[in-house]
Amino acid sequence: MAIKFRSSSDREMNRGSFADLRKLNNDELVILRANIETELNRRGISFKVGEVGEKLVISFFNSKPGLPNLLQAPVGAKNVDALSRDGERYSIKTFMKAKKTGTVYPDEKDRDKQLFEYLVVAKLDTNYRLFAIYRYPWGDFVRIRAWDRRMNAWYLPLSKKNLDMAELIFNKEPSHED
């Protein structure tokens, strides 16, 4: 996803002429991060891994012919982050280094009730760029999900075996056939 710059000074800032972060000591860097987080919050901009992943996945799907166009689900929709034009529900989970996804809370009355049509798992690199996108239909999620007793919810262990079971939508890694 490219950043559109409003002016040449914006481009210069992105190249590093605005501030060379390598010149800051650790304390200065932490203070800068705190100030940036404060300003993001003031503007209502979230920079949590999960929310960044949701936006990147929706944008990726919408930019690729052959993939459904997705719309962000209404705020507060339980376990659903995006909707296709055909009404299919997508739950999007994002990770960088984690060993499992975030939780999927079951229906209070029926623990096995279908909550979405697809679980999409997005892997981001440490620069918050898409590294891989995996898609699981509901039935596959049900077969490989695990129960978190503390959270009273489902999650997906991010083992190689489980990731290999998914439909690989995008992968930044070079294939072994290259």
List the predicted regions and their residue ranges:
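Nucleic-acid endonuclease domains
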Residues: 1-178
